[in-house]
């Protein structure tokens, strides 16, 4: 993959991830002045995850690092724009949720209940369920860690 192709794919990924970030921000009644920042943060998070996955990281660690980035930037923007960090961060991480893995695990569970147990279906179910659970865990931990780092009252030692 050439550099130009990678940059075009990255731009496409960032633009397409900004759209659901704004959509969910509107569902969550985010103020209108914060909508462009939610889009930018969603694009930065998803784009950084794509860059890390292209560099060879697996999707779980890439999601964790991207959600750390989203959480840190969201805390900084909340200080600048006098809003709660969740205004920016929650809608921004929703495009990184593992829809395909969760859907595949659910379909495998339905097939097992309908057709009976088979080892390939069980392997598909467990693999996709564990992947989806790990990604959701990485998102939640990655969003909460910057707040624990930056809002700490006691000394670290």
UniProtKB/Swiss-Prot annotation:
It holds the Pfam family ThrE_2. One of its GO terms (biological process) is succinate transport. Its main location: membrane. It is found in: Cell inner membrane. Keywords: Cell inner membrane, Cell membrane, Membrane, Transmembrane, Transmembrane helix, Transport. InterPro entries: ThrE_2, ThrE_Dicarb/AminoAcid_Exp, YjjB. The chain crosses the membrane at residues 8-28, 55-75, 87-107, 129-149. GO terms for cellular component: plasma membrane. It is a multi-pass membrane protein. Involved in succinate export with YjjP. Both proteins are required for export. NCBIfam families: PRK09917.1 (NF007391). The transporter is composed of YjjB and YjjP. Belongs to the ThrE exporter (TC 2.A.79) family. This is Probable succinate transporter subunit YjjB. It comes from Citrobacter koseri (strain ATCC BAA-895 / CDC 4225-83 / SGSC4696).
């Amino acid at each position: 993959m050439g550099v130009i192709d990678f940059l075009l794919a990255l731009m496409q990924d960032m633009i397409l991830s900004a759209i659901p970030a704004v959509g969910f921000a509107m569902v969550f009644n985010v103020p209108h002045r914060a909508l462009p920042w939610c889009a930018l943060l969603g694009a930065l998070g998803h784009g950084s995850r794509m860059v890390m996955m292209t560099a060879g990281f697996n999707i779980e660690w890439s999601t964790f690092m991207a959600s750390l980035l989203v959480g840190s930037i969201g805390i900084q923007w909340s200080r600048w724009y006098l809003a709660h960090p969740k205004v920016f961060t929650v809608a921004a991480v929703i495009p990184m949720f593992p829809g395909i893995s969760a859907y595949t695990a659910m379909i495998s569970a339905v097939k097992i209940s309908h057709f009976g147990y088979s080892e390939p279906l069980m392997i598909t179910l467990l693999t996709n369920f564990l992947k989806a659970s790990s990604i959701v865990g990485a998102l939640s931990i990655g969003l909460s860690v910057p707040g624990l780092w930056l809002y700490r009252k006691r000394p670290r030692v």
